[in-house]
Amino acid sequence: MKVKICGITDMETAKRACEYGADALGFVFAESKRKITPGLAKEIIQELPANVLKIGVFVNESVEVIQKITENCGLTHVQLHGGEDNHQIRRLNIPSIKSLGVTSESDMKNAQGYETDYILFDSPKEKFHGGNGKAFPWELLAHMPKELREKTILAGGLNTLNIEEAIRTVRPYMVDVSSGVETEGKKDVEKIKQFIIKAKECSK
């Protein structure tokens, strides 16, 4: 099971997450309490292992700005949380992830229409897109076609207490956590460690 830790804002957390086995780190460039500047993101990314995915999170940003930040920071993928369509995705010409809020089983069919490398299924948006700490009914994704499952990233309210059930129900390619590994709004490296251990153990 691949694991993504999202909302990275400091070097120490990024390095520890990689040491514990994180496969991907997320850097939020959209409005969020976890927003990071491109300059700081670049400093952190330059120190990370080559095999770890560096994913930039954007919401309804222009193609030109996304391309500039991707190039300057050394991102490997972009994660799109707004109303981006296939025309914009093709113009980006960057490995991409489309985030969709899940409210019904029909969202799986909608997901198959996007020309992205991965689909991230998340809880419906609230004030900010993603990172709200709320789970959605995972059984809505239980009967996913194999070709979609192989590119699915599961997010939304995941933590060390529910990650095993979430993986058993959805069987995604990757799981994505942000608030579920925080204490009082800050990333907690011990929670990150335990989350990664549980996610990887229950998928063996």
From Swiss-Prot:
The enzyme's E.C. designation: 5.3.1.24
GO MF annotations, alphabetized: phosphoribosylanthranilate isomerase activity
Keywords, sorted A to Z: Amino-acid biosynthesis, Aromatic amino acid biosynthesis, Isomerase, Tryptophan biosynthesis
Gene3D superfamilies linked to this entry: Aldolase class I
SUPFAM superfamilies: Ribulose-phoshate binding barrel
Pathway: Amino-acid biosynthesis; L-tryptophan biosynthesis; L-tryptophan from chorismate: step 3/5
Catalysed reaction equations from the record: N-(5-phospho-beta-D-ribosyl)anthranilate = 1-(2-carboxyphenylamino)-1-deoxy-D-ribulose 5-phosphate
Gene Ontology biological-process entries: L-tryptophan biosynthetic process
First-tier enzyme category under EC: isomerase
Stated family: Belongs to the TrpF family.
Protein name as catalogued: N-(5'-phosphoribosyl)anthranilate isomerase
Organism expressing this protein natively: Bacillus cereus (strain AH820)
